[in-house]
Amino acid sequence: MQSVSDATRYYFLPLTPPMPDLPPTSASPTPWTRKHLLGLQDLSAGELTTILNEAERYKTKWNAGETKFDDLRGTAVANLFFEPSTRTKTSFSLAAKRLSADTIDFTASSSSLSKGETFIDTALNIQAMGIHQMVVRHSSSGAPEQLAREVDCCVINAGDGTHEHPTQGLLDIFTIRSHRPSLQGLTVALVGDIKHSRVARSNIWGLTKLGARVIVCGPPTLMPVGIEEFGVEVAHRLDDVLEQCDCINLLRVQFERQRGAYFPSVREYAHLYGMNGTRMKHAKPDVLILAPGPINRGVEITPDVADGQNSVILDQVTNGLFIRMACLSLLNGARSVQTQQEQSR
């Protein structure tokens, strides 16, 4: 069995770059048949659009006053979080409950992991209690994929190491789509710690497949080698690309994943890459300011920008609920179809 600590294949290199015919000029919805959601790298533009459209369906009903749905009634969802989380864990838990599923929230610190039980054995024991879907966050890149090979239930990646965070990427894209008629031709800047950011990876896969122009911006020390091969442009000075951007997604510096100093000081980083009122004056008047959170006020973003009229940060949190409802619903539908097919054989 592959060790989840073997994370080498989950960095930008040596992953296989997208095929030359990407990104597409348009994307029609594609019927959803996948049992797991492990990342955006392997999804087609049509599959991405299917998730976004399903999220839009829930959002429309929600805004019309419908806040409870029966789509997952009779099923059980387990949130297995082996890393701390506020927004993602709460959002998935609430999404499952809004769909009428039974939910359990697993906490690693109070589990049998402290007694030597393995990650896989823990998951298999939880599945044996009648779980239909598992939402997994883990510090090791590739852990959800390994789990998906061992369990019969659906697996959703809620963030694994520096690999991917697919639902965060989806909700970022959904938020942009909610404010713009199309992603095609939009210029989106991902600013900050690209090297350690699973959010950056999922955003790059999703945005480029849907036709956006993506600029990654940050210190050279926080930029993965060879990232240009993935259809993005690289900038090391935010001021050089600021006026071109339709959307700016400010990524948190991942101090907990860093070994050593990647820039002189936090103050220096904020001076070069932080979004502040002065920079807003040079940006497009309708630029969208995003941040996956948690935000560090005064580092990647100043309070006046975070709370300003261009900020859609809280919209991202709200939209995360609809994206996760969509993912849970679509995977459950695919699981039901596969179960029926197996029973009919």
What are these regions (language model features)?
Residues 99, 130, 150-152, 210, ...:
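Short, structured coil segments at secondary-structure junctions
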Residues 286-345:
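Adenosine-phosphate binding glycine-rich loop
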Residues 82-94, 178-251:
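Glycine-rich phosphate/diphosphate-binding loop of Rossmann-like nucleotide-binding domains
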Residues 72-77, 184-186, 286:
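Phosphate-coordination loops involved in phosphoryl transfer and adenosine-cofactor binding
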Residues 20-90, 94:
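Positively charged, low-complexity intrinsically disordered leader regions
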Residues 66-177, 297:
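Phosphate/diphosphate ligand-binding glycine-rich loop within oxidoreductases
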Residues 227-304:
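Rossmann-like adenosine-cofactor binding region
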